[in-house]
Swiss-Prot record:
One of its GO terms (molecular function) is methyltransferase activity. Belongs to the methyltransferase superfamily. LaeA methyltransferase family. This is Protein-methionine methyltransferase laeA. The gene is laeA. It comes from Emericella nidulans (strain FGSC A4 / ATCC 38163 / CBS 112.46 / NRRL 194 / M139). It catalyses: L-methionyl-[protein] + S-adenosyl-L-methionine = S-methyl-L-methionyl-[protein] + S-adenosyl-L-homocysteine.
Length: 374
């Protein structure tokens, strides 16, 4: 049922999509592209100095880290309380830097959710590898939107001679991490940044849909910061529910996704994912050798294949932890729904996620794209 290989495809209103107790209305064929709007300049700019020890250190020469394992420049944790300030909304904690720009919370519940998705992605890849794209073992790796830092930390542990940097809007990364790994937050990767053009061996981005306004600008910036011949890897979930029968008809799951798609489009940070737009934007940015893989993510273990069932168990847990987190800010900010209405819809969706009579699945997209050699 699930095939590996390329697939191509990508309303604003203050009123949520019409429904009749979750009656499903077929979505429009319109597949709007991502916003091309620019962001304001970022006031935190450079982390260009640090290099992998084995590549640049020589006997008796200067080490790229100081005695306590910190880089020669300080990570981007600001002492300005306004930058690190968090705020409460709907009983959840959100980041304070560029308040309201990102619709997901950053509290412990959300951090657990992000770590579950990280595990899901490694399981879904079969080989359970952290990176698909070619890369040196002593390279410079950059993780955009690193969240809890789990990917960066695991890569740093696996490749002790590499340097791994993670950037994120929220400073939620652990203070204790490998000495060859650093985090820089708050950091808005959509704003202009200078982190050493032509200096990174791999740039990684995971689950950016819903947080990015201008994909073409972001891809051009990523392209500029990679070394010639280096790779960019992106992992995204298309949350639009699919099934190969009619078990999704009239479900809360379908209604929930339609509402979420519309609300995030209204905020100009659409959660809807288009592989066609992604590949075109990567090509327009200058990338070549673009590889696109898709993996089916069953919503619960209804599938007969054992690997699919293993993936489904992790994805069921991930989705169960995600529905309310994904819904709170978009539905309250855009539709002005009361908390009780959001929680009721989330509960209905979670109930369906455990129903093996509903044969729903989502699609995981994995992209690798190379910056050409000069």
């Amino acid at each position: 049922m699930f095939e590996m290989g390329p697939v191509g495809t990508r309303l604003p209103a203050m009123t949520s999509p019409a429904h009749n107790h979750y009656s499903y209305h077929s979505p429009t064929s319109s597949d709007r592209g991502r916003s091309r709007q620019n962001s304001d300049a970022m006031d935190i700019q450079s982390i260009t100095e640090r290099e992998p020890a084995t590549r640049y250190a020589v006997a008796g020469g200067p080490a790229p880290w100081n005695r306590n394992g910190s880089p020669s420049m300080s990570p981007m944790y600001s002492n300005n309380s306004e930058r690190n300030q968090f705020h409460e909304e709907n009983g959840r904690t959100y980041h304070g830097f560029r308040r309201g720009m990102y619709f997901l919370p950053c509290d412990e519940q959300e951090q657990d959710r992000l770590d579950i998705f990280h595990k899901l992605f490694t399981v879904a890849r079969v080989s359970e590898s952290l990176i698909y794209a070619p890369h040196p073992t002593n390279g410079r790796f950059l993780d955009l939107g690193c969240g809890t830092g789990i990917w960066a930390i695991e890569v740093a542990n696996k490749y002790p001679d590499a340097f791994v940097a993670g950037v994120d809007l929220a400073p939620i990364q652990p203070p204790n991490h490998p000495k060859n790994c650093e985090f820089y937050a708050p950091f808005d990767f959509e704003a202009p940044w200078a982190m050493g053009e032509d200096s990174w061996d791999l740039i990684h981005l995971q689950m950016g849909c819903g947080s990015v306004m201008g994909w073409p600008n972001l891809y051009r910036r990523i392209f500029a910061h990679l070394r010639p011949g280096a790779w960019f890897e992106q992992v995204e979930i298309d949350f639009e529910p699919r099934c190969d029968d009619r078990s999704l008809d009239g479900t809360a799951l379908r209604h929930w996704y339609d509402c979420l798609k519309q609300a995030t489009a209204e905020t100009m940070r659409p959660i809807a994912h288009s592989s066609r737009d992604t590949i075109k934007d990567l090509q327009d940015a200058g990338f070549t050798e673009i590889d696109h893989q898709i993996v089916g993510l069953p919503l619960n273990p209804w599938h007969q294949d054992e690997h699919e069932r293993k993936v489904a168990r992790w994805y069921n847990l991930a989705v169960s932890e995600s529905i309310e987190n994904l819904s709170l800010a978009p539905f309250s900010r855009v539709y002005r729904w009361p908390l009780e209405r959001i929680q009721q819809l989330a509960a209905d969706v979670k109930s369906e996620a455990f129903n093996k009579e509903i044969h729903a699945y989502n699609i995981l997209h994995i992209y690798q794209a190379r910056k050409p050699l000069r």
